[in-house]
From Swiss-Prot:
It catalyses: 2-(N(omega)-L-arginino)succinate = fumarate + L-arginine. Its EC number is 4.3.2.1. GO terms for molecular function: argininosuccinate lyase activity. It is found in: Cytoplasm. This is Argininosuccinate lyase. GO terms for biological process: arginine biosynthetic process via ornithine; L-arginine biosynthetic process. Belongs to the lyase 1 family. Argininosuccinate lyase subfamily. It comes from Prosthecochloris aestuarii (strain DSM 271 / SK 413). It is an enzyme of class 4 (lyase). It comes from the Bacteria. InterPro entries: Arg_succ_lyase_C, Argininosuccinate_lyase, Fumarase/histidase_N, Fumarate_lyase_CS, Fumarate_lyase_fam, Fumarate_lyase_N, L-Aspartase-like. Keywords: Amino-acid biosynthesis, Arginine biosynthesis, Cytoplasm, Lyase.
Length: 460
């Protein structure tokens, strides 16, 4: 590649661009990520120019063949973008000029870098959305499989990080399934707004050349076409919406990771994360750290930062295009890659995580989380719920003070709190009975969980 770096816009200026200013403004180290999208967009644009007789067919052929060769050069590493090229668009056009001469300049007929980069970004977003949706599909599949495998395993359900009520482990996994299903729906809905071609808007006011924007749209397989050329190049709301969707996905992963970190700790000891997804300590030999889960939790903050960066970049920009928008690429690329890789590694880790069923079974059977069953037992005996709650609270205090458990407390002792208690109370205090007593829609009963599993499989 030639050592002389030509800036595409420099002819109007009498002094060369300051070298340090060029280094400061160069984005090629970041936007080289878009080289495939940029070449795809250029090939479509040149094809349209040829079909509309704006450039000769033979010149279009040379340009397209040159672009295809450049794509191969970049992908194999034989063409390495340099910061002096300013951006990936300049890298490609300068290399094309080296290959085919001055006719390379016709690639930009009727096109600005404004609609060029807007097109590249939308193509990148379409690909990113599909990749993350595929990763979510794989995660949802594992969640349903886990729900089915553990549908009759009883664990603690928590509120305020306090043991609350016994639930089916399958019910727990399906809760996260539904969260990630909504994440998928958000991306699916966003795709419709991304799938709109901005090519043909030029700088922002359109072009005097007889461009066929509809043909460019079809060649690039966009569903829709921009309505307003200013809007087409000057907003980045689709990036903000995408990074927001990524932030919500990461938030759900982070909450899930927190559960796994806590539940795999010695203090909880409810589940086992495979050694393949844990690390040890360089000084404490006994340690097994849930590092992958912790990293997912930590990377969530990065994606939140990407969202804040995008909102801040755009908040004060007048119409239409401003160079500030160059700074949309780092948060976009980081959010996309971080979210995709986090979903994928979390899926692998979850697939290799197992619940300690025997330990949980013994813990749940004697736990105070069965107290709600006592209150509802009294309600079924026609006691007002507030009174039942008060009576049960006193029973819980007695159990704590006496060191007994709810199932082990005698009927005689129960009757000191209310004469409504009878032998059938002990049936209600069995964890499986507690779980299966739930009658409402979407609840934790085994029958309800099995229905939810069937429904979930249709939504993978």
């Amino acid at each position: 590649m030639s050592k002389k770096k030509e800036l595409l816009w420099q002819s109007r200026f009498s002094e060369p661009f300051d070298r340090e200013a060029l280094l400061f403004s160069s984005s090629v180290d970041v936007d080289k990520e878009l080289y495939q999208e940029d070449i795809t967009g250029s090939i479509a644009h040149v094809t349209m120019l040829s079909e509309e007789a704006i450039i000769p067919a033979e010149e279009a052929r040379l340009i397209i063949e040159g672009l295809q060769e450049i794509e191969e050069e970049i992908s194999t590493g034989s063409l390495v973008p340099h910061w002096e090229d300013e951006d990936i668009h300049t890298v490609i056009e300068n290399r094309l000029k080296e290959k085919i001469g001055p006719i390379a300049g016709k690639i930009h007929s009727g096109r600005s870098r404004n609609d060029q980069v807007a097109t590249d970004t939308r193509l990148y977003l379409k690909r990113s959305i599909e990749e993350i949706r595929q990763a979510l599909k794989e995660l949802k599949t594992v969640l349903v499989d886990k729900a089915e495998a553990y549908r009759r395993t009883i664990i603690f359900g928590y509120t305020h990080l306090q043991r609350a009520q016994p639930i089916s482990a399958g019910h727990y996994y399906l809760a996260y399934f539904n969260m990630f299903d909504r994440d998928n729906q958000r991306l699916q809905d966003l795709y419709k707004r991304v799938d709109i071609s901005p090519l043909g808007a030029a700088a922002f006011a359109g072009s005097t050349l007889a461009l066929n924007a509809e043909r460019s749209r079809d060649l690039l397989e966009f569903e829709g076409l921009f309505h307003n050329s200013i809007d087409a190049v000057s907003d980045r709301d689709i990036i903000i919406e995408f990074v927001s969707a990524c932030s919500i996905i990461m938030m759900h992963l982070s909450r899930f990771a927190e559960d796994l970190i806590l539940w795999s700790s010695y203090e909880f000891n409810y589940l086992e994360i495979s050694d393949a997804f844990a690390t040890g300590s360089s000084i404490m030999p006994q340690k097994k750290n849930a590092d992958i889960a912790e990293l997912v939790r930590g990377k969530t903050g990065r994606v939140y930062g990407d969202l804040m960066a995008m909102l801040t970049i755009m908040k004060g920009l007048p119409l239409s295009y401003n160079r500030d928008m160059q700074e949309d690429k780092p948060p976009l690329f980081d959010a996309s890659k971080t979210t995709r890789s986090s979903v994928r590694i979390f899926t692998k880790m979850l697939e290799n995580t197992s619940i300690k069923e025997n330990r949980l079974s013994s813990l749940v059977a004697k736990d105070l989380s069965l107290a709600t069953e006592i209150a509802e037992y009294l309600v079924q005996k026609n006691m007002p719920f507030r009174d039942a709650h008060r009576v049960t609270g006193k029973i819980v205090s007695h159990v704590i003070e006496s060191g007994t458990t709810l199932p082990d407390m005698t009927l005689e002792t129960y009757r000191t709190f209310s004469d409504l208690f009878d032998e059938d109370l002990y049936d209600a205090l069995k964890p499986e009975a507690s779980v299966n007593a739930k009658k409402t829609h979407g609840s934790t009963s085994f029958a309800s969980v099995e229905e939810q599993i069937v429904s979930a499989r249709t939504r993978i």
